[in-house]
Design a protein with these regions (language model features):
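A flexible loop/linker signature enriched in serine peptidases of the S9 family
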Residues: 1-7, 30-35, 54-63, 78-82, ...
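Non-catalytic accessory segments flanking enzyme active sites
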Residues: 1-42, 53, 132-185, 218, ...
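Cap/lid segment of the alpha/beta-hydrolase catalytic domain
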Residues: 23-44, 52-61, 70-75, 266, ...
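Structural WD40 beta-propeller signal
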Residues: 44-46, 89-91, 139, 186, ...
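Hydrophobic beta-strand positions that form the internal "hydrophobic ladder"
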Residues: 47-51, 95, 145, 190-192, ...
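Beta-propeller blade termini and top-face loops
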Residues: 61, 99-102, 106-114, 121-123, ...
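Core domains of intracellular innate-immunity/apoptotic signalosomes
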Residues: 66-90, 114
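Active-site-proximal cap/loop segments of hydrolase catalytic domains
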Residues: 390-602
Length: 602
Protein backbone atom coordinates (compact mmCIF):
# COMPACT_ATOMS: atom_id res chain seq x y z
CA UNK A 1 0.00 0.00 0.00
CA UNK A 2 1.05 3.59 -0.61
CA UNK A 3 3.52 4.84 1.96
CA UNK A 4 4.04 1.49 3.68
CA UNK A 5 7.38 -0.31 3.95
CA UNK A 6 5.97 -3.85 3.93
CA UNK A 7 3.29 -5.92 2.23
CA UNK A 8 -0.33 -6.30 3.31
CA UNK A 9 -1.68 -9.79 2.49
CA UNK A 10 -5.37 -9.97 1.61
CA UNK A 11 -7.93 -12.42 0.25
CA UNK A 12 -11.42 -12.39 -1.27
CA UNK A 13 -13.94 -15.19 -1.03
CA UNK A 14 -15.24 -16.72 -4.25
CA UNK A 15 -14.94 -13.64 -6.47
CA UNK A 16 -12.72 -10.62 -7.02
CA UNK A 17 -15.85 -8.52 -6.46
CA UNK A 18 -16.17 -9.79 -2.88
CA UNK A 19 -15.06 -7.78 0.14
CA UNK A 20 -11.34 -7.77 0.82
CA UNK A 21 -10.12 -9.41 4.02
CA UNK A 22 -6.68 -8.62 5.42
CA UNK A 23 -5.09 -11.85 6.62
CA UNK A 24 -1.67 -10.43 7.56
CA UNK A 25 -0.31 -6.90 7.70
CA UNK A 26 3.48 -7.07 7.77
CA UNK A 27 3.64 -3.40 8.75
CA UNK A 28 1.92 -4.15 12.06
CA UNK A 29 4.28 -7.03 12.79
CA UNK A 30 7.31 -4.93 11.85
CA UNK A 31 6.56 -2.10 14.29
CA UNK A 32 9.52 -1.50 16.57
CA UNK A 33 11.80 -3.77 14.52
CA UNK A 34 14.89 -2.52 12.68
CA UNK A 35 14.59 -5.52 10.38
CA UNK A 36 11.60 -7.65 9.43
CA UNK A 37 11.05 -10.35 6.84
CA UNK A 38 8.36 -12.96 6.23
CA UNK A 39 9.53 -16.51 5.44
CA UNK A 40 6.57 -18.85 4.94
CA UNK A 41 2.95 -17.75 4.43
CA UNK A 42 0.56 -20.70 4.16
CA UNK A 43 -3.22 -20.91 4.63
CA UNK A 44 -4.63 -24.22 5.89
CA UNK A 45 -6.73 -26.34 3.48
CA UNK A 46 -9.98 -25.27 5.21
CA UNK A 47 -8.95 -21.59 4.92
CA UNK A 48 -9.31 -21.01 8.68
CA UNK A 49 -5.68 -20.88 9.81
CA UNK A 50 -2.63 -18.99 8.61
CA UNK A 51 0.90 -20.21 9.24
CA UNK A 52 3.58 -17.56 8.87
CA UNK A 53 7.19 -17.15 9.95
CA UNK A 54 9.25 -14.07 10.75
CA UNK A 55 12.90 -13.06 10.95
CA UNK A 56 13.64 -9.87 12.91
CA UNK A 57 17.42 -9.60 12.60
CA UNK A 58 18.45 -10.90 9.16
CA UNK A 59 19.88 -14.18 10.45
CA UNK A 60 17.40 -16.22 8.35
CA UNK A 61 16.37 -18.25 11.41
CA UNK A 62 12.58 -17.91 11.36
CA UNK A 63 9.91 -18.22 14.05
CA UNK A 64 6.65 -19.93 12.96
CA UNK A 65 3.30 -18.75 14.35
CA UNK A 66 -0.28 -19.86 13.63
CA UNK A 67 -3.08 -17.30 13.32
CA UNK A 68 -6.84 -18.00 13.48
CA UNK A 69 -8.24 -16.03 10.55
CA UNK A 70 -11.79 -15.71 11.89
CA UNK A 71 -10.71 -13.98 15.12
CA UNK A 72 -7.12 -12.86 14.48
CA UNK A 73 -6.03 -14.83 17.55
CA UNK A 74 -2.54 -16.31 17.67
CA UNK A 75 -2.43 -19.92 18.79
CA UNK A 76 0.13 -20.79 21.48
CA UNK A 77 2.06 -23.04 19.07
CA UNK A 78 5.40 -21.34 18.35
CA UNK A 79 8.40 -22.88 16.59
CA UNK A 80 11.85 -21.27 16.41
CA UNK A 81 14.94 -21.87 14.28
CA UNK A 82 13.11 -22.80 11.09
CA UNK A 83 14.05 -22.09 7.49
CA UNK A 84 11.83 -21.56 4.43
CA UNK A 85 9.80 -24.76 3.98
CA UNK A 86 6.47 -25.86 5.43
CA UNK A 87 3.40 -27.93 4.46
CA UNK A 88 -0.09 -28.40 5.90
CA UNK A 89 -1.60 -31.87 6.00
CA UNK A 90 -5.23 -32.06 4.88
CA UNK A 91 -6.59 -32.58 8.41
CA UNK A 92 -5.97 -28.84 9.10
CA UNK A 93 -4.21 -29.60 12.39
CA UNK A 94 -0.99 -31.30 11.33
CA UNK A 95 1.89 -29.61 9.56
CA UNK A 96 5.48 -30.41 8.62
CA UNK A 97 8.34 -27.95 9.08
CA UNK A 98 12.13 -27.82 8.93
CA UNK A 99 14.82 -27.04 11.49
CA UNK A 100 18.30 -25.53 11.15
CA UNK A 101 21.48 -27.09 12.49
CA UNK A 102 24.39 -25.18 14.05
CA UNK A 103 25.68 -24.28 10.57
CA UNK A 104 22.20 -22.94 9.65
CA UNK A 105 21.53 -25.80 7.26
CA UNK A 106 17.92 -27.03 7.06
CA UNK A 107 18.59 -30.63 8.01
CA UNK A 108 15.54 -32.02 9.79
CA UNK A 109 11.82 -32.41 8.94
CA UNK A 110 9.44 -32.58 11.88
CA UNK A 111 5.69 -33.02 12.32
CA UNK A 112 3.57 -30.87 14.62
CA UNK A 113 -0.05 -31.29 15.69
CA UNK A 114 -1.73 -28.09 16.87
CA UNK A 115 -2.21 -27.95 20.61
CA UNK A 116 0.61 -30.37 21.41
CA UNK A 117 4.04 -29.56 22.82
CA UNK A 118 6.59 -28.54 20.21
CA UNK A 119 9.24 -30.29 22.30
CA UNK A 120 7.50 -33.60 21.59
CA UNK A 121 7.33 -33.16 17.79
CA UNK A 122 8.53 -36.33 16.06
CA UNK A 123 11.28 -36.16 13.46
CA UNK A 124 10.08 -37.64 10.17
CA UNK A 125 13.47 -37.31 8.46
CA UNK A 126 16.95 -36.16 9.46
CA UNK A 127 19.70 -35.51 6.90
CA UNK A 128 23.09 -36.28 8.44
CA UNK A 129 25.25 -35.57 5.39
CA UNK A 130 26.25 -31.90 5.78
CA UNK A 131 26.42 -31.44 2.00
CA UNK A 132 22.63 -31.77 1.67
CA UNK A 133 19.90 -29.18 2.23
CA UNK A 134 16.37 -30.28 3.13
CA UNK A 135 13.10 -28.88 1.75
CA UNK A 136 9.43 -29.66 2.47
CA UNK A 137 6.63 -28.90 0.00
CA UNK A 138 3.10 -29.94 -0.92
CA UNK A 139 2.02 -30.95 -4.41
CA UNK A 140 -0.32 -28.66 -6.35
CA UNK A 141 -2.73 -31.60 -6.43
CA UNK A 142 -2.82 -31.27 -2.61
CA UNK A 143 -2.56 -35.06 -2.38
CA UNK A 144 1.07 -35.50 -1.31
CA UNK A 145 3.69 -33.91 0.91
CA UNK A 146 7.34 -34.21 -0.14
CA UNK A 147 10.60 -34.08 1.77
CA UNK A 148 13.47 -33.45 -0.62
CA UNK A 149 17.20 -33.34 0.13
CA UNK A 150 19.72 -32.11 -2.41
CA UNK A 151 23.38 -31.31 -2.76
CA UNK A 152 25.18 -29.93 -5.81
CA UNK A 153 25.51 -33.49 -7.15
CA UNK A 154 22.69 -35.66 -5.79
CA UNK A 155 19.01 -35.68 -4.82
CA UNK A 156 16.65 -37.84 -2.80
CA UNK A 157 12.87 -37.35 -2.46
CA UNK A 158 10.31 -38.93 -0.12
CA UNK A 159 6.54 -38.47 0.06
CA UNK A 160 3.56 -39.12 2.31
CA UNK A 161 -0.20 -39.00 1.69
CA UNK A 162 -1.43 -35.55 2.79
CA UNK A 163 -4.70 -37.16 3.93
CA UNK A 164 -2.82 -39.55 6.21
CA UNK A 165 0.00 -37.58 7.87
CA UNK A 166 0.55 -40.38 10.42
CA UNK A 167 1.81 -42.58 7.60
CA UNK A 168 5.41 -43.37 6.75
CA UNK A 169 7.28 -41.48 4.06
CA UNK A 170 8.06 -43.46 0.90
CA UNK A 171 11.42 -43.05 -0.85
CA UNK A 172 11.16 -42.46 -4.60
CA UNK A 173 14.78 -43.19 -5.50
CA UNK A 174 17.92 -43.39 -3.34
CA UNK A 175 20.62 -40.80 -3.94
CA UNK A 176 23.36 -41.50 -6.44
CA UNK A 177 26.37 -39.34 -7.20
CA UNK A 178 25.80 -37.07 -10.19
CA UNK A 179 22.07 -37.89 -10.31
CA UNK A 180 19.72 -34.98 -9.65
CA UNK A 181 15.94 -35.11 -9.74
CA UNK A 182 12.86 -33.12 -8.67
CA UNK A 183 9.27 -34.35 -8.52
CA UNK A 184 5.70 -33.20 -9.13
CA UNK A 185 2.51 -35.24 -8.76
CA UNK A 186 -0.37 -35.95 -11.15
CA UNK A 187 -2.96 -38.62 -10.39
CA UNK A 188 -1.35 -42.04 -10.34
CA UNK A 189 2.05 -40.89 -11.62
CA UNK A 190 4.96 -38.63 -10.87
CA UNK A 191 6.52 -36.29 -13.40
CA UNK A 192 10.23 -35.95 -12.71
CA UNK A 193 12.94 -33.64 -14.01
CA UNK A 194 16.26 -35.49 -13.98
CA UNK A 195 19.75 -35.38 -15.46
CA UNK A 196 20.00 -39.17 -15.76
CA UNK A 197 21.54 -39.72 -19.21
CA UNK A 198 20.58 -36.11 -19.93
CA UNK A 199 23.19 -33.44 -19.21
CA UNK A 200 20.64 -30.65 -19.58
CA UNK A 201 17.84 -32.57 -17.85
CA UNK A 202 14.68 -34.16 -19.23
CA UNK A 203 11.13 -35.04 -18.13
CA UNK A 204 10.35 -38.63 -17.15
CA UNK A 205 7.32 -40.28 -15.57
CA UNK A 206 6.87 -43.13 -13.11
CA UNK A 207 3.92 -44.70 -11.24
CA UNK A 208 3.21 -43.44 -7.72
CA UNK A 209 2.65 -47.05 -6.63
CA UNK A 210 6.13 -48.13 -7.76
CA UNK A 211 8.30 -45.04 -8.28
CA UNK A 212 11.72 -46.72 -8.19
CA UNK A 213 14.19 -46.22 -11.03
CA UNK A 214 13.21 -49.42 -12.89
CA UNK A 215 9.90 -47.77 -13.77
CA UNK A 216 11.22 -44.39 -14.90
CA UNK A 217 10.57 -43.75 -18.59
CA UNK A 218 11.02 -40.70 -20.78
CA UNK A 219 7.87 -38.62 -21.13
CA UNK A 220 9.30 -36.15 -23.66
CA UNK A 221 12.28 -36.66 -25.98
CA UNK A 222 15.54 -35.30 -24.62
CA UNK A 223 16.85 -32.21 -26.41
CA UNK A 224 20.50 -31.50 -25.50
CA UNK A 225 20.13 -27.91 -26.73
CA UNK A 226 17.42 -27.13 -24.15
CA UNK A 227 17.95 -26.97 -20.37
CA UNK A 228 14.87 -28.18 -18.46
CA UNK A 229 14.59 -26.37 -15.12
CA UNK A 230 11.23 -27.49 -13.72
CA UNK A 231 7.92 -29.20 -14.46
CA UNK A 232 4.58 -28.11 -12.98
CA UNK A 233 1.59 -30.43 -13.28
CA UNK A 234 -1.98 -29.20 -13.79
CA UNK A 235 -5.12 -31.25 -14.38
CA UNK A 236 -4.76 -31.46 -18.18
CA UNK A 237 -1.36 -29.91 -18.85
CA UNK A 238 2.29 -29.90 -17.92
CA UNK A 239 4.08 -26.56 -17.80
CA UNK A 240 7.80 -26.96 -18.41
CA UNK A 241 10.22 -24.18 -17.48
CA UNK A 242 13.24 -24.27 -19.80
CA UNK A 243 16.17 -22.30 -21.13
CA UNK A 244 16.66 -22.00 -24.87
CA UNK A 245 19.55 -20.11 -26.46
CA UNK A 246 20.38 -18.54 -23.13
CA UNK A 247 16.88 -17.18 -22.53
CA UNK A 248 14.08 -18.44 -20.26
CA UNK A 249 11.24 -20.26 -22.01
CA UNK A 250 7.93 -21.89 -21.08
CA UNK A 251 6.57 -24.94 -22.87
CA UNK A 252 3.04 -26.32 -22.51
CA UNK A 253 2.27 -30.02 -22.93
CA UNK A 254 -1.31 -31.26 -23.37
CA UNK A 255 -1.53 -34.44 -21.26
CA UNK A 256 -4.33 -35.89 -23.38
CA UNK A 257 -2.96 -35.31 -26.88
CA UNK A 258 0.75 -35.12 -26.04
CA UNK A 259 1.01 -31.98 -28.18
CA UNK A 260 3.45 -29.31 -27.00
CA UNK A 261 3.91 -25.63 -27.79
CA UNK A 262 5.98 -22.70 -26.54
CA UNK A 263 4.77 -19.38 -25.20
CA UNK A 264 6.45 -16.71 -27.32
CA UNK A 265 8.00 -13.49 -26.05
CA UNK A 266 9.19 -10.82 -28.46
CA UNK A 267 11.88 -8.82 -26.67
CA UNK A 268 15.57 -9.66 -27.23
CA UNK A 269 16.20 -10.17 -23.52
CA UNK A 270 13.76 -10.64 -20.64
CA UNK A 271 12.83 -12.55 -17.48
CA UNK A 272 9.84 -14.89 -17.23
CA UNK A 273 8.73 -17.39 -14.61
CA UNK A 274 5.62 -19.05 -13.24
CA UNK A 275 3.61 -17.31 -10.56
CA UNK A 276 2.49 -19.36 -7.54
CA UNK A 277 -0.42 -21.04 -9.43
CA UNK A 278 -1.96 -22.91 -6.46
CA UNK A 279 -4.97 -24.27 -8.39
CA UNK A 280 -4.59 -27.74 -9.94
CA UNK A 281 -7.89 -27.95 -11.87
CA UNK A 282 -7.42 -25.06 -14.28
CA UNK A 283 -6.56 -24.40 -17.90
CA UNK A 284 -4.97 -21.05 -17.04
CA UNK A 285 -1.35 -20.65 -15.97
CA UNK A 286 -0.26 -17.36 -14.45
CA UNK A 287 3.11 -15.97 -15.57
CA UNK A 288 5.36 -13.21 -14.23
CA UNK A 289 7.15 -11.31 -17.00
CA UNK A 290 9.42 -8.30 -17.20
CA UNK A 291 12.37 -6.96 -19.16
CA UNK A 292 14.65 -3.95 -19.03
CA UNK A 293 11.84 -2.03 -20.75
CA UNK A 294 8.61 -3.78 -19.70
CA UNK A 295 7.60 -3.28 -16.04
CA UNK A 296 6.72 -6.30 -13.90
CA UNK A 297 3.66 -7.86 -15.52
CA UNK A 298 1.21 -10.56 -14.48
CA UNK A 299 -0.08 -12.53 -17.47
CA UNK A 300 -2.76 -15.22 -17.54
CA UNK A 301 -2.11 -17.72 -20.33
CA UNK A 302 -4.91 -19.97 -21.58
CA UNK A 303 -3.24 -23.31 -22.29
CA UNK A 304 -6.06 -24.40 -24.62
CA UNK A 305 -6.75 -21.26 -26.70
CA UNK A 306 -3.09 -20.13 -26.39
CA UNK A 307 -4.14 -16.58 -25.62
CA UNK A 308 -2.37 -14.21 -23.23
CA UNK A 309 -4.26 -11.80 -21.01
CA UNK A 310 -2.35 -9.04 -19.25
CA UNK A 311 -3.84 -8.85 -15.76
CA UNK A 312 -1.59 -6.16 -14.36
CA UNK A 313 1.50 -4.17 -15.27
CA UNK A 314 3.25 -2.39 -12.42
CA UNK A 315 2.84 1.39 -12.70
CA UNK A 316 5.99 3.46 -13.11
CA UNK A 317 6.02 7.03 -11.86
CA UNK A 318 7.69 9.98 -13.53
CA UNK A 319 6.18 9.89 -17.02
CA UNK A 320 7.91 6.66 -18.04
CA UNK A 321 7.52 5.70 -21.72
CA UNK A 322 8.71 2.34 -23.05
CA UNK A 323 9.32 3.89 -26.45
CA UNK A 324 12.13 6.03 -24.99
CA UNK A 325 14.34 2.99 -24.29
CA UNK A 326 16.12 0.19 -26.15
CA UNK A 327 17.65 -3.16 -25.25
CA UNK A 328 19.77 -5.62 -27.18
CA UNK A 329 21.76 -8.79 -26.76
CA UNK A 330 25.37 -9.00 -27.94
CA UNK A 331 28.14 -11.57 -27.59
CA UNK A 332 31.72 -11.13 -26.40
CA UNK A 333 34.42 -13.64 -27.23
CA UNK A 334 36.12 -15.20 -24.20
CA UNK A 335 39.83 -16.05 -24.01
CA UNK A 336 39.10 -19.61 -25.17
CA UNK A 337 36.81 -18.51 -28.02
CA UNK A 338 33.48 -19.16 -26.27
CA UNK A 339 30.82 -16.51 -26.93
CA UNK A 340 29.46 -14.84 -23.79
CA UNK A 341 25.99 -13.23 -23.97
CA UNK A 342 25.58 -9.67 -22.71
CA UNK A 343 22.21 -7.97 -22.17
CA UNK A 344 22.31 -4.21 -22.80
CA UNK A 345 19.94 -1.41 -21.85
CA UNK A 346 20.15 2.27 -22.77
CA UNK A 347 18.04 5.23 -23.76
CA UNK A 348 17.15 5.70 -27.40
CA UNK A 349 19.43 8.25 -28.96
CA UNK A 350 22.44 6.72 -27.25
CA UNK A 351 25.56 7.36 -29.33
CA UNK A 352 27.92 4.41 -29.67
CA UNK A 353 30.97 6.66 -29.66
CA UNK A 354 32.95 5.45 -26.66
CA UNK A 355 31.99 8.28 -24.29
CA UNK A 356 29.16 6.78 -22.22
CA UNK A 357 29.47 5.63 -18.60
CA UNK A 358 28.79 1.92 -18.09
CA UNK A 359 27.48 -0.09 -15.15
CA UNK A 360 28.17 -3.78 -15.76
CA UNK A 361 26.83 -6.46 -13.42
CA UNK A 362 27.50 -10.17 -13.12
CA UNK A 363 27.12 -13.19 -10.85
CA UNK A 364 28.25 -16.47 -12.43
CA UNK A 365 27.79 -19.08 -9.69
CA UNK A 366 25.64 -22.02 -8.54
CA UNK A 367 24.11 -22.40 -12.01
CA UNK A 368 21.87 -19.40 -11.28
CA UNK A 369 20.70 -17.45 -14.31
CA UNK A 370 20.70 -13.66 -14.17
CA UNK A 371 18.03 -12.46 -16.58
CA UNK A 372 17.12 -8.95 -17.68
CA UNK A 373 14.30 -7.62 -15.52
CA UNK A 374 12.69 -4.27 -14.89
CA UNK A 375 13.98 -1.85 -12.28
CA UNK A 376 12.87 1.75 -11.92
CA UNK A 377 16.23 2.35 -10.24
CA UNK A 378 18.03 1.28 -13.41
CA UNK A 379 15.84 3.68 -15.39
CA UNK A 380 17.30 6.50 -13.29
CA UNK A 381 20.79 5.47 -14.44
CA UNK A 382 20.09 5.23 -18.15
CA UNK A 383 18.23 8.54 -17.95
CA UNK A 384 21.59 9.97 -16.91
CA UNK A 385 23.28 8.61 -20.02
CA UNK A 386 24.49 5.28 -18.61
CA UNK A 387 24.60 2.01 -20.47
CA UNK A 388 23.46 -0.78 -18.14
CA UNK A 389 24.60 -4.33 -18.88
CA UNK A 390 24.48 -7.87 -17.52
CA UNK A 391 27.33 -10.25 -18.39
CA UNK A 392 25.93 -13.81 -18.55
CA UNK A 393 29.22 -15.44 -17.67
CA UNK A 394 30.09 -19.09 -17.08
CA UNK A 395 29.24 -20.43 -13.66
CA UNK A 396 25.67 -19.26 -14.18
CA UNK A 397 22.97 -21.39 -15.73
CA UNK A 398 21.97 -19.32 -18.73
CA UNK A 399 23.27 -21.74 -21.36
CA UNK A 400 22.77 -25.04 -19.57
CA UNK A 401 24.57 -27.40 -17.26
CA UNK A 402 27.91 -27.31 -19.09
CA UNK A 403 27.85 -23.50 -18.87
CA UNK A 404 27.58 -23.88 -15.10
CA UNK A 405 30.20 -26.61 -14.76
CA UNK A 406 32.69 -24.63 -16.84
CA UNK A 407 32.61 -21.91 -14.17
CA UNK A 408 33.02 -23.89 -10.93
CA UNK A 409 35.65 -25.89 -9.03
CA UNK A 410 38.90 -26.03 -11.05
CA UNK A 411 37.33 -24.01 -13.88
CA UNK A 412 36.19 -21.10 -11.68
CA UNK A 413 38.59 -18.65 -13.30
CA UNK A 414 36.52 -18.83 -16.49
CA UNK A 415 33.91 -16.77 -14.63
CA UNK A 416 36.43 -14.01 -14.05
CA UNK A 417 38.09 -14.01 -17.46
CA UNK A 418 34.65 -14.05 -19.12
CA UNK A 419 33.71 -10.90 -17.21
CA UNK A 420 36.95 -9.19 -18.20
CA UNK A 421 36.31 -10.15 -21.84
CA UNK A 422 32.78 -8.72 -21.66
CA UNK A 423 34.09 -5.45 -20.23
CA UNK A 424 36.79 -5.15 -22.89
CA UNK A 425 34.27 -5.94 -25.63
CA UNK A 426 31.92 -3.17 -24.51
CA UNK A 427 34.81 -0.70 -24.49
CA UNK A 428 36.14 -1.87 -27.88
CA UNK A 429 32.68 -1.67 -29.44
CA UNK A 430 32.33 1.86 -28.03
CA UNK A 431 29.38 1.14 -25.77
CA UNK A 432 31.49 2.60 -22.95
CA UNK A 433 34.32 5.02 -22.33
CA UNK A 434 37.57 3.31 -21.24
CA UNK A 435 37.78 5.25 -17.96
CA UNK A 436 34.06 5.31 -17.18
CA UNK A 437 33.35 1.69 -16.24
CA UNK A 438 31.69 0.74 -12.96
CA UNK A 439 30.97 -2.88 -12.04
CA UNK A 440 28.57 -4.31 -9.46
CA UNK A 441 28.10 -7.73 -7.89
CA UNK A 442 26.90 -9.22 -4.63
CA UNK A 443 27.72 -12.32 -2.57
CA UNK A 444 29.31 -14.78 -5.04
CA UNK A 445 29.07 -11.86 -7.47
CA UNK A 446 31.13 -9.93 -4.92
CA UNK A 447 33.81 -12.61 -5.26
CA UNK A 448 33.68 -11.87 -8.99
CA UNK A 449 34.22 -8.17 -8.27
CA UNK A 450 37.23 -8.83 -6.06
CA UNK A 451 38.81 -11.30 -8.46
CA UNK A 452 38.54 -9.15 -11.60
CA UNK A 453 39.71 -6.10 -9.66
CA UNK A 454 42.89 -7.99 -8.82
CA UNK A 455 43.27 -9.31 -12.37
CA UNK A 456 42.69 -6.05 -14.23
CA UNK A 457 42.70 -3.05 -11.88
CA UNK A 458 43.29 -0.79 -14.89
CA UNK A 459 40.05 -1.84 -16.60
CA UNK A 460 37.57 -0.56 -14.02
CA UNK A 461 37.06 2.91 -12.60
CA UNK A 462 34.76 1.87 -9.76
CA UNK A 463 33.67 -1.36 -8.08
CA UNK A 464 30.58 -1.96 -5.94
CA UNK A 465 30.82 -5.20 -3.95
CA UNK A 466 27.74 -6.07 -1.88
CA UNK A 467 28.19 -8.61 0.95
CA UNK A 468 31.13 -10.04 -1.04
CA UNK A 469 32.47 -13.57 -0.58
CA UNK A 470 36.10 -12.49 -0.72
CA UNK A 471 37.97 -14.55 1.89
CA UNK A 472 37.42 -17.76 -0.04
CA UNK A 473 40.36 -19.80 1.18
CA UNK A 474 39.84 -19.07 4.87
CA UNK A 475 36.05 -19.53 4.79
CA UNK A 476 36.19 -22.79 2.86
CA UNK A 477 38.78 -24.10 5.34
CA UNK A 478 36.39 -23.74 8.29
CA UNK A 479 33.69 -26.46 8.21
CA UNK A 480 31.89 -24.93 11.21
CA UNK A 481 30.78 -21.92 9.15
CA UNK A 482 27.39 -21.89 7.39
CA UNK A 483 27.54 -23.14 3.78
CA UNK A 484 31.18 -24.31 3.89
CA UNK A 485 30.62 -28.08 3.71
CA UNK A 486 27.57 -27.80 1.45
CA UNK A 487 29.66 -25.78 -0.99
CA UNK A 488 32.66 -28.06 -1.32
CA UNK A 489 31.02 -29.19 -4.56
CA UNK A 490 30.88 -25.59 -5.82
CA UNK A 491 34.35 -24.33 -4.91
CA UNK A 492 36.25 -27.44 -3.82
CA UNK A 493 37.62 -28.61 -0.47
CA UNK A 494 40.91 -26.85 0.36
CA UNK A 495 42.05 -29.90 2.35
CA UNK A 496 42.83 -31.26 -1.12
CA UNK A 497 46.05 -29.51 -2.23
CA UNK A 498 44.89 -29.02 -5.81
CA UNK A 499 41.82 -27.09 -4.64
CA UNK A 500 43.83 -25.20 -2.01
CA UNK A 501 46.31 -23.99 -4.61
CA UNK A 502 43.59 -23.11 -7.11
CA UNK A 503 41.53 -21.13 -4.57
CA UNK A 504 44.67 -19.39 -3.36
CA UNK A 505 45.33 -18.22 -6.91
CA UNK A 506 42.05 -16.27 -7.15
CA UNK A 507 40.74 -15.60 -3.61
CA UNK A 508 40.42 -11.78 -3.56
CA UNK A 509 41.75 -11.29 -0.02
CA UNK A 510 44.83 -13.43 -0.68
CA UNK A 511 45.74 -11.67 -3.92
CA UNK A 512 45.70 -8.00 -2.94
CA UNK A 513 48.87 -6.26 -4.05
CA UNK A 514 50.25 -2.77 -3.61
CA UNK A 515 48.57 -1.42 -6.71
CA UNK A 516 46.42 1.39 -8.06
CA UNK A 517 43.01 -0.22 -7.60
CA UNK A 518 39.64 1.20 -8.67
CA UNK A 519 37.37 3.17 -6.37
CA UNK A 520 35.58 0.68 -4.13
CA UNK A 521 32.30 0.62 -2.21
CA UNK A 522 31.77 -2.47 -0.02
CA UNK A 523 28.68 -3.36 2.00
CA UNK A 524 28.24 -5.93 4.79
CA UNK A 525 25.52 -7.12 7.17
CA UNK A 526 26.30 -7.74 10.83
CA UNK A 527 23.84 -10.67 11.04
CA UNK A 528 24.65 -12.15 7.64
CA UNK A 529 24.66 -15.98 7.93
CA UNK A 530 26.00 -16.55 4.41
CA UNK A 531 28.93 -14.13 4.16
CA UNK A 532 30.12 -13.23 7.66
CA UNK A 533 30.60 -9.49 8.16
CA UNK A 534 34.29 -9.96 8.92
CA UNK A 535 35.01 -11.13 5.36
CA UNK A 536 34.37 -7.77 3.67
CA UNK A 537 35.76 -5.96 6.75
CA UNK A 538 39.16 -7.68 6.67
CA UNK A 539 39.29 -7.35 2.87
CA UNK A 540 38.81 -3.59 3.14
CA UNK A 541 41.27 -3.35 6.05
CA UNK A 542 44.01 -5.04 4.05
CA UNK A 543 43.38 -2.72 1.12
CA UNK A 544 43.47 0.34 3.37
CA UNK A 545 46.91 -0.70 4.54
CA UNK A 546 48.10 -0.59 0.92
CA UNK A 547 45.75 2.17 -0.27
CA UNK A 548 46.80 4.83 -2.76
CA UNK A 549 45.54 8.21 -1.59
CA UNK A 550 43.80 9.15 -4.84
CA UNK A 551 41.26 6.33 -4.53
CA UNK A 552 37.92 6.15 -2.73
CA UNK A 553 37.59 3.11 -0.44
CA UNK A 554 34.35 2.79 1.57
CA UNK A 555 32.86 0.11 3.82
CA UNK A 556 29.24 0.34 4.99
CA UNK A 557 28.10 -2.26 7.53
CA UNK A 558 24.38 -2.60 8.19
CA UNK A 559 24.24 -3.23 11.93
CA UNK A 560 20.66 -4.54 11.90
CA UNK A 561 20.43 -6.73 8.80
CA UNK A 562 21.78 -9.84 7.12
CA UNK A 563 22.66 -11.03 3.63
CA UNK A 564 19.82 -9.26 1.82
CA UNK A 565 20.37 -5.83 3.32
CA UNK A 566 17.53 -3.72 4.69
CA UNK A 567 14.08 -5.31 4.67
CA UNK A 568 11.72 -2.35 4.16
CA UNK A 569 11.15 -1.34 0.56
CA UNK A 570 12.04 2.33 1.12
CA UNK A 571 15.17 1.37 3.04
CA UNK A 572 16.12 -0.96 0.18
CA UNK A 573 15.75 1.92 -2.26
CA UNK A 574 18.10 4.00 -0.12
CA UNK A 575 20.71 1.25 -0.38
CA UNK A 576 20.37 1.17 -4.19
CA UNK A 577 20.52 4.98 -4.27
CA UNK A 578 23.80 4.91 -2.35
CA UNK A 579 25.33 2.40 -4.77
CA UNK A 580 24.16 4.28 -7.84
CA UNK A 581 25.27 7.63 -6.40
CA UNK A 582 28.73 6.12 -5.92
CA UNK A 583 28.80 5.05 -9.59
CA UNK A 584 27.49 8.41 -10.81
CA UNK A 585 29.97 10.38 -8.73
CA UNK A 586 33.08 8.32 -9.46
CA UNK A 587 32.35 8.11 -13.20
CA UNK A 588 31.62 11.86 -13.32
CA UNK A 589 28.24 11.17 -14.87
CA UNK A 590 25.35 13.58 -15.02
CA UNK A 591 23.63 14.06 -11.66
CA UNK A 592 20.42 14.99 -13.48
CA UNK A 593 18.34 12.75 -15.77
CA UNK A 594 18.45 13.64 -19.45
CA UNK A 595 15.51 13.63 -21.82
CA UNK A 596 15.58 11.65 -25.05
CA UNK A 597 15.72 14.96 -26.90
CA UNK A 598 18.90 15.95 -25.04
CA UNK A 599 20.51 12.61 -25.83
CA UNK A 600 19.68 13.05 -29.50
CA UNK A 601 21.35 16.45 -29.44
CA UNK A 602 18.29 18.38 -30.64
Amino acid sequence: ETGKQYAVHCRKKGSLDANEEVILDENELAKGQKYFRIGILSVSPNHKLLAYSTDTNGSEAYVIRIKTLETGELLPDEISNSSYSFAWANDNKTFFYDQLDDAQRPYKALKHILGTSVNQDPTVYEEKDARFFLEIYKSRSEKLIFVSVESERASEVRFVDADHPKGEFTLIRPRENDLLYSVDHHGDRFFIVTNENAKNFKVVETPVASPDKEHWKDYLPYDPEVKVDAVDAFENHLVISERRNGLPAIRICDLKSGETHEINFDEPTYEVSLDRNPVFKTGIVRIDYSSFITPNSVIDYDMVSRRKELKKEAPVLGGYKKSDYASERVFAKADDGVEIPISLFYKKGFRKDGTAPLLLTGYGAYGISTDANFSSSTISLVDRGFVFAIAHIRGGGELGRTWYEDGKLLKKKNTFTDFVSCTQYLIDQKYAAPKRVAILGGSAGGLLMGAVMNMRPDLFTSVIAAVPFVDVLNTMSDPSLPLTVTEYEEWGNPQDPKYFDYMASYSPYDNIEENQYPNLLVTAGLNDPRVSYWEPAKWVAKQRKLKHQNRILLLKTNMGAGHGGDSGRFDQLKEVAMEYAFAIDTLHASSRPESAKQLLGR
